[in-house]
Amino acid sequence: ANNTVSIAQAQFEPKAWFRGIYADETPVGFIMLFDDPDEPVYFLWRLLVGAEFQGMGYGRQAIAHLVDYVKSRPNATELKVSHVPELPGNPGPFYQKLGFEYTGEDDDGELVMRLKL
């Protein structure tokens, strides 16, 4: 989903935690988490970085900040994300470089990855 759809979804989901990603004053992306402090597993719902800003470290920095945030939450033991491997720009290798591992789960065609905290 694009930024507009993601922001609209976040407005109607009380457990959505979302932030813009900026380079100084320039918006370069968007990150959204399903934030349920009653659960030990948190889910990275969206990470969107504009094509012209990819490969510049913004996504990596956003994930690092997100991991710090999740570690501060009660009961947090892992952060999960899923992706469709057949789509262009498959983010699997990006997440693997950040320490995420495949779980073997398939969530409706999306491969699930996890980062133990």
Located regions from the model:
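Conserved acetyl-CoA pyrophosphate-binding loop and the N-cap/start of the following alpha-helix
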Residues: 53, 57-65
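Acetyl-CoA-dependent GNAT
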Residues: 1-45, 50-52, 69, 73, ...
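Conserved acetyl-CoA-binding loop of GNAT-fold acetyltransferases
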Residues: 95-105
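Conserved alpha-helical elements of the SDR catalytic core
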Residues: 66, 70, 98
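Short beta-strand-to-coil "C-cap" segments at the C-terminal boundary of structured domains/repeats
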Residues: 114-117
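Conserved beta-strand-loop-alpha-helix junction that forms the acyl-donor binding cleft
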Residues: 80-92, 108-110
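Conserved GNAT acetyl-CoA-binding A-motif
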Residues: 70-84
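Active-site acidic-Proline motif in GNAT/NAT acetyltransferases
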Residues: 50-56, 85-87
